[in-house]
Amino acid sequence: YAAAIEDANTNNTKEKTLLVNRPVENTPVEASDLAVAVHGSGTDLCILSYGNGYYLSRQAEKELAEKGIECRVVDLRWLAPLDESGIIEQAQACKKVLIVDECRKTGSISEAIMTLLYENATNSANAVQRLCAHDSFIPLGSAAYHVLPSKEDIVNIASEMCLTNTKAESKA
């Protein structure tokens, strides 16, 4: 949306099905402000996400705080082009990074973000994990919850990453 305003071009918009009919904040988008949106200032964990993954990450943020994990949730806001400098800046400010992506693990935007972080951020390789949907068709209705990331998945992986020394396994 913001890029369409900036370029004054017609663009196709994809909307996450699980976000339909969810309340949203009505904040005006300035064409000159196309940076990532950062919520929180914790340094234990940076959660990078967008769409419904962002919504679930904000829910998980509350449970993680109860476990003593201070995190920040970064809303990517748009995927092309990525705000690479904003992503790197937020990742470097934290000890660990979790990328939450509702797309399938293979070929998702999380691959580009992982590459960006490995090439440019100072976090060690085991400090960056991703949580993605299974490599399968995404079913409709309640069956979708068997293959898509959930708030519980985010809390579990984030807890493993921050409270233990073992490398968390991503879903899929």
Give a label for each model feature:
Residues 6-7:
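Basic phosphate/pyrophosphate-binding loop/patch that engages nucleotide-derived ligands
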Residues 2, 11-12, 16-172:
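Thiamine diphosphate
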